[in-house]
Amino acid sequence: MKTLMVFDPAMCCSTGVCGTDVDQALVDFSTDVQWLKQCGVQIERFNLAQQPMSFVQNEKVKAFIEASGAEGLPLLLLDGETVMAGRYPKRAELARWFGIPLDKVGLAPSGCCGGNTSCC
């Protein structure tokens, strides 16, 4: 099974979903992380404020921070390879990385615009 490592910028808590001004992208990603875990996916998250040594000890992450700064986070590594930086992925992107069919995601084409109909 593939492993996704997420290196988050410094946040007040492990998910960033706290306080009064919550970033919707973090809410969505936190929900998607839970969904992936239910699908049996291995995910590890590291918060720069809470686990700075994890950033220093990983050579790829260390090099990324030296080149892009903490402003370039989040950094996502899939089996040790960079798959995304600077934003959190959408559920469809996560599904593609892990080979989860889109119908399991609720994003499969449906209705009259899917298939060979001309009703749209």
Curated annotation (Swiss-Prot):
The processes (GO biological process) annotated in the record are:
negative regulation of DNA-templated transcription; response to arsenic-containing substance
Region forming the signal peptide:
none
Q: Which UniProt keywords apply?
A: Arsenical resistance, DNA-binding, Plasmid, Repressor, Transcription, Transcription regulation
Any single GO molecular-function term of the entry would be: DNA binding
Query: Looking at the keywords, is Transcription regulation present?
Result: yes
The record, for InterPro entries, names: Arsenical-R_ArsD
This chain's function reads: Inducer-independent trans-acting repressor of the ars operon.
NCBIfam families, A to Z: chaperon_ArsD
Name recorded for this polypeptide: Arsenical resistance operon trans-acting repressor ArsD
